[in-house]
Amino acid sequence: KYVKLGNAKAIYESLSLKSDKIEAYYNETENSSMDIANVIAKKNVVIEDKKMKIVGGNFAEYNVKKDYFKVNGSKLQLTSQMNILRSNNRMEYWRSKGVAVATGGAEAQKENEFIVKADRLVWNLHEINKKITVKKIIGFSNVSIRSNNEVAFSDKGIYNNITEVCKLFGNVRLQRGDSFLTGEYAEVDLKSGISKILPAPKKGPNESKVRALIEKETKE
């Protein structure tokens, strides 16, 4: 075990971890060398990785083998390019898988274009020119998306950053001014401002894999 106090900092590849206290735990290998297994950070946690930044953490744990971060705090914020992800409870980040998850009062914002809220939000990330950007946003439970001219509600939502279309599933309600539409599935085009209630499509395999990943890590 290694402990550092006061403006502590740990660096691993492109990843940087800062906090008031850092504890590193080692595993002894067959050739008697020591490999870092877990890193724990306490108070004023700041995590940076290729222009992506997480702040507001009171406690963070990094599993080196899984390349997985778990951060706790009441005012967590992840910033990547023009996008912001917030949580009042927990944030998780799988570096190698390109997935970030906010649980508890989750909120995703893209400048002044829209705000998505849900009990749990998932960011699918990808790297372009050594910068991490948001490819897709998935919301679970009590989902709402607010744009400049409309508010939409559903049980689940999937936003594609490339097409700028948000797909809403289950108990959908679209509200614009005093008028509203209801249904089980809708597509909200945030670029054109056009929203449609449509027949529900079949469940996509990518969303199933993301949910399985989240549930597996949550149980461990």
Question: Whereabouts are the PLM-identified features?
Answer:
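Mature-chain termini and adjacent capping regions
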Residues: 1-220
